[in-house]
């Protein structure tokens, strides 16, 4: 979880970059 967030769709993406 460190440095990462989870979108409402459950997709993981970097806090510093756009969802990928």
UniProtKB/Swiss-Prot annotation:
Subcellular location: Secreted
A Gene Ontology term for the protein's cellular component: extracellular region
Predominant place of localization: secreted
InterPro entries in alphabetical order: LCN-type_CS_alpha_beta_dom, Scorpion_toxin-like_sf
GO molecular function, one term: toxin activity
PROSITE patterns tied to this protein: LCN_CSAB
Tissue specificity statement from the Swiss-Prot or TrEMBL entry: Expressed by the venom gland.
LCN-type CS-alpha/beta domain ranges (all copies): 1-20
Record key words, sorted: Disulfide bond, Ion channel impairing toxin, Neurotoxin, Secreted, Toxin, Voltage-gated sodium channel impairing toxin
Protein family according to the UniProt entry: Belongs to the long (4 C-C) scorpion toxin superfamily. Sodium channel inhibitor family. Beta subfamily.
Cited function: Beta toxins bind voltage-independently at site-4 of sodium channels (Nav) and shift the voltage of activation toward more negative potentials thereby affecting sodium channel activation and promoting spontaneous and repetitive firing.
The record's note on its domains: Has the structural arrangement of an alpha-helix connected to antiparallel beta-sheets by disulfide bonds (CS-alpha/beta).
Protein name (database record): Putative beta-neurotoxin
Species, as recorded: Tityus pachyurus
């Amino acid at each position: 979880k460190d440095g990462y967030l989870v979108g409402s769709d459950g997709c993981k993406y970097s806090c510093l970059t756009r969802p990928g």
